[in-house]
């Protein structure tokens, strides 16, 4: 019986070594993980989702944008500020920058790089008072009063006709900075 037990133990040890070698570890290159961010000395930190957001304006009939100054229905969006200290700054304003239509310095021009882009229309952003923002990279929006913690600064975007619009893709980009006072 002892001999049978010893034989089984030796056999188990030998087969365990073979099984281990059969499932050898393989390592391959996987890729790169990029980390992006910024440490700021400011009253608040811009929320990651606000730093690179897309506002969906949807489809608007060109008949609704037939004359200079006509607007689509507004679509709300916000710039969220986190970890705010009202003791550091009591107010925040947003400074937008972007390419504008020559005759309308408060209307973003569309990215007309693709065939089939809309014409005679741009995008206007309104601040929380309904005032159109400038896109010169210098002029700040109306001040927003900060509270401690999280703050959402509300805006609205509209399509803005600069003449009789024609249908097509109507996309634009703007960058922003936050000014604390």
Curated annotation (Swiss-Prot):
SUPFAM superfamilies: Bacterial adhesins
Recorded phenotype for the gene knockout or disruption: Deletion leads to loss of fimbriation and a decrease of hemagglutination.
Keywords, alphabetical: Disulfide bond, Fimbrium, Signal
Gene3D superfamilies associated with the record: Fimbrial-type adhesion domain
Keyword Zinc among record annotations: no
GO BP annotation list: cell adhesion involved in single-species biofilm formation
Classification via InterPro entries: Adhesion_dom_fimbrial, Adhesion_dom_fimbrial_sf, Adhesion_dom_sf, Bact_Fimbrial_Adh_Pro
Location in or out of the cell: Fimbrium
Other comment: This protein belongs to the group of SfA (S-fimbrial adhesins), which are associated with uropathogenic strains and with strains causing newborn meningitis.
NCBIfam families, sorted: PRK15194.1
Family statement: Belongs to the fimbrial protein family.
Protein known as: S-fimbrial protein subunit SfaA
Source organism: Escherichia coli O6:K15:H31 (strain 536 / UPEC)
Name of the encoding gene: sfaA
